[in-house]
Amino acid sequence: MALNPTLTSWRGQRVWLIGASSGIGLACAQALHQAGASVCVSARKAAALDGFVAQHPGARALALDVTDADSVAQAASAAWGEQGLDWVVYCAGHYQAHEATAFDLPDMLRHQDVNYTGALRVLDVLLPRLLAQGHGHVSLVSSVAGYRGLPKSLAYGPTKAALTHLAEALYFDLHPAGLGVSVVNPGFVQTPLTAQNDFHMPALMQPADAAQCMLLGWQRGDFEIHFPKRFTRWM
């Protein structure tokens, strides 16, 4: 049974993706644009965003820093515009392999600020507008690293566990108000973040394949979207 409204076509859907300059976020933006959605992309790297817009007619770019509340508020207002938004997808992420034997508090807090608190800043601005609008969908891109403690995931894993927990709580509060909520828990995907890993990454996926899994899950009305199944079911 679908926990969110299903979707038959992306054509005309207004989607704002935060963290879309590379990796999964960029691949999702590309797939959504190809499917006919009206796409707005945001990240810190303005040049990468401008490159996306140049290659995808009709797309918009809004540079922001998710660790800066004013930056988020300005970009959110611009993304909302006069027509509102149908989808808000939080893909922003920071990752460095960490072990407790080399504890690094500043970078631990950087993980928290980007991966979790950044999502809160976006929600703080947009939830009142989405509730007033009476429809819309919030999707948080988490990770299977949030399922349980894993090696070298001392900083990253807990922030993703928090993001998944946040999505679950949001669903209970927002579903009765007519809003959709989903959480995406990818396994290993070939991105600039995972490129630093010096260990074997089982069932490694390409970003374009991950994006297709996400679009299909959103269309089906899934709450949790996890992939690849041969890996995530084991987790």
Locate the predicted segments by residue:
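Conserved glycine-rich cofactor-binding loop
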Residues: 21-22
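Active-site helix of classical SDR
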Residues: 123, 159
